[in-house]
């Protein structure tokens, strides 16, 4: 299967010095090298066509012992895509199951860490429109008969230790079922046979029970896309104590009393300058926080589901002028917004979801889909902090973030030279460098531009840099709102198109002249200004009322919000500016200043952050290409996380360790 569920990275056994992103397939193949089951006979090398499942879906050999290092030199080479749609790792069981559903039914299930986790999912995504279709799980032995086309899921253990397994039921016979799968049998199927194994089925008054051909495995059950929930399993939820956060400390042996970062490296030097020293936060350098593996799984599921929910809300907004007007985006730009959504809906690189996670549950505050930060600390600095500290428990849940970003860039439409546009800001310096590293790793050239310095027009009106390279692709740290502010200032009611300059050497190139230029491919796309705007929150609530990850939100104060408390947020605010937290009886719990006080506001149900060791803690997850990419933690002594709030080391602990060491 594809990934270690806590986000752990395994070393590629063919190259001990190369870290690979979330490659549980290496872990699985290492085991099978020395402990290969006698039930599996390997004849055909990795990638060989073994046969076909119904619908002409190819089944490939996944004998990793025979994978060619030249053809598969790194982790990215193992990733399987059909067009823009990611299937999984070649040629794992999950890759086959997702590809089967995609080709035969036009649906896919959300990304998972291990095959057995599929049994906890409750929706499939329809690829053509991102509609969420109900998916029900039926336990092995229940009264709901399995049917052809169902997913069949195994628990981790035995032949499928660590990962579990997934197959497709192709036929249901009176006393057996036939299945198609990958990563079990590596030899060719008989001509015309469209199944890999036949499993006995016991039928009784109690229900239908499937037996595996391996005697050390457990079949969890089958999954059917249906609205009918009779005999189905409820969606599992982690117990409340699993969603708590813990504080841990390493022994102070002077590890952080001196210089532990490399001041000669530009990235390190920029980070040190921004932090005013060699430190991971402005608080205790020897403290870190931990969450359970169950909590991490819940965050993965929430991230994947919420991203799709935000896409649905964005689609609704862009189809309704009455909703779009709440976002305070100049009407001059509405056609561009809709074109961006139509043409670049799936061309995102990364964003960040902000959560409150505690024993009360998991709730999302907002989605920074436009100009997210925190990647550099989570994907680089926190690893080096842990190495310097020594004796740190668990794993960094963003360990593979840079690799994930590099892979996403490889499958993007970006030109070979990407210009990174950033503000004159110390923090943005190292954020830009981190993304530059990911781009270079992906095989691109990346040039950092501060503001619009060095950009100008040639004699034909093309936008070029100071080395005469044409600007074709831009990744920006700027929020789209900054450009919108410029547009509001410069555009007049007489304008019939965005006022983009295309010449005049004496004129200074403005941000708007870069980001709105039609031939410049900007990441993140213009449409991400919609999900990043707080005005999306009431739309989300109207589409998915009482959803377990959402907080009530409204454009106007409601009796329920007044009674139970609310947060007042400016619709295009950033960095926690101009937020008011109002408790019961209209009591002011907290308020922040900032530059967004004149904006319209939305009102969101009050849901305060948990406090651990006098720090209010906010969990954040990264999306990469629309899928979960990592987790980080921010903290502050006040209830509102702001731009200058700390990042904190975060580790994922196995549940038994988490509960055994809970303080």
PLM segments and residue spans:
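N-terminal polybasic/positive-inside topogenic patches
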Residues: 2-5, 20-21
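Preference for protein termini
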Residues: 2-3, 232-663
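Aromatic- and glycine-rich peptidoglycan recognition patches
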Residues: 161-235
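Short, Lys/Arg-enriched N-terminal segments with co-localized hydrophobic residues
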Residues: 19-32
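...with weaker cross-activation on analogous glycine-rich loops/strands in unrelated enzymes
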Residues: 119-184
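N-terminal capping segments
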Residues: 34-123
């Amino acid at each position: 299967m594809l990934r270690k569920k806590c986000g752990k990275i395994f070393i590629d056994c063919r190259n001990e010095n190369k870290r690979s992103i979330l490659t549980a397939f290496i872990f699985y193949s290492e085991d099978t090298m020395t402990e290969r089951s006698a039930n599996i006979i390997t004849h055909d090398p990795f990638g060989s066509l073994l046969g076909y499942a119904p619908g002409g879906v190819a089944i490939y050999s996944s004998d990793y012992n025979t994978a060619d290092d030249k053809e598969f030199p790194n982790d990215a080479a193992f990733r399987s895509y059909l067009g823009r749609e990611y299937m999984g790792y070649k040629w794992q069981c999950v890759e086959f199951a997702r590809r089967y559903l995609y080709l035969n039914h036009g649906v896919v299930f959300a990304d998972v860490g291990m095959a057995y986790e599929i049994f906890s999912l409750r929706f499939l995504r329809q690829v053509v429109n991102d509609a969420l279709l109900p998916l029900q799980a039926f336990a092995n032995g229940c009264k709901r008969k399995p049917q052809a086309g169902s997913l069949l899921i195994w628990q981790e253990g035995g032949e499928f230790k660590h990962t579990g397994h997934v197959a497709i039921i192709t036929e249901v016979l009176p006393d057996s079922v036939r299945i198609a799968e990958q990563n079990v049998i590596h030899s060719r199927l008989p001509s015309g046979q469209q199944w890999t194994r036949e499993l006995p089925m016991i039928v009784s008054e109690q229900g239908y029970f499937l037996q595996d051909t391996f005697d050390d495995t457990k079949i969890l059950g089958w999954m059917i896309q249906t609205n009918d929930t009779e005999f189905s399993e409820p969606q599992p939820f982690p117990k409340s104590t699993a969603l708590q956060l813990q504080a841990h400390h390493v022994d102070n042996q002077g590890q952080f009393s001196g210089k532990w970062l490399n001041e000669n490296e530009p990235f390190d030097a920029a980070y040190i300058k921004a932090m005013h020293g060699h430190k991971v936060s402005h608080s205790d350098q020897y403290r870190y926080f931990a969450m359970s593996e169950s909590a991490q799984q819940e965050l993965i599921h929430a991230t994947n589901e919420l991203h799709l929910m935000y896409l649905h809300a964005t689609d609704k907004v862009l189809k309704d002028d009455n909703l779009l007007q709440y976002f305070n985006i100049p009407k001059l730009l509405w056609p561009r917004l809709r074109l961006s959504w139509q043409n670049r809906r799936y061309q995102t690189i990364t964003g960040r979801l902000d959560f409150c996670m505690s024993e009360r549950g998991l709730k999302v505050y907002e989605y920074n889909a436009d100009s997210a930060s925190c990647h550099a600390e989570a994907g680089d600095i926190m690893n080096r902090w842990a190495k310097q500290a020594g004796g740190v428990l668990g794993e960094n849940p963003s360990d593979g973030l840079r690799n994930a970003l590099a892979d996403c860039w490889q499958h993007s439409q970006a030109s070979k030279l990407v210009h990174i546009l950033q503000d004159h800001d110390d923090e943005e310096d190292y954020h830009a460098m981190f993304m530059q590293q990911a781009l270079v790793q992906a095989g691109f050239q990346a040039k950092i531009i501060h503001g619009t310095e060095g950009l100008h027009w040639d004699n034909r009106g093309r936008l070029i840099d100071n080395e005469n390279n044409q600007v074709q692709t831009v990744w920006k740290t700027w929020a789209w709102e900054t450009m919108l502010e410029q547009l509001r200032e410069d555009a007049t009611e007489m304008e019939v198109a965005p006022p983009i300059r295309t010449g005049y050497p004496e004129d200074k190139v403005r941000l708007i002249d870069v980001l709105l230029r039609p031939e410049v491919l900007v990441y993140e796309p213009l449409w991400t200004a919609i999900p990043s705007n707080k005005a999306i929150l009431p739309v989300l609530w109207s589409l998915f009322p009482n959803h377990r990850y959402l907080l009530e939100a409204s454009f106007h104060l409601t009796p329920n919000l007044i009674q139970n408390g609310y947060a007042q947020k400016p619709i295009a605010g950033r960095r926690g500016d101009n937020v008011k937290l109002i408790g019961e009886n209209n009591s002011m719990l907290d308020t922040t200043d900032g530059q967004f006080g004149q904006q319209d506001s939305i009102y969101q149900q009050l849901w305060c952050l948990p406090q651990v060791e006098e720090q209010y803690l906010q969990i954040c997850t990264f999306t990469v290409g629309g899928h979960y990419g990592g987790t980080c933690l921010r903290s502050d002594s006040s209830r509102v996380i702001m731009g200058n709030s700390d990042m904190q080391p975060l580790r994922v602990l196995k549940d038994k360790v988490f509960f055994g060491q809970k303080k």
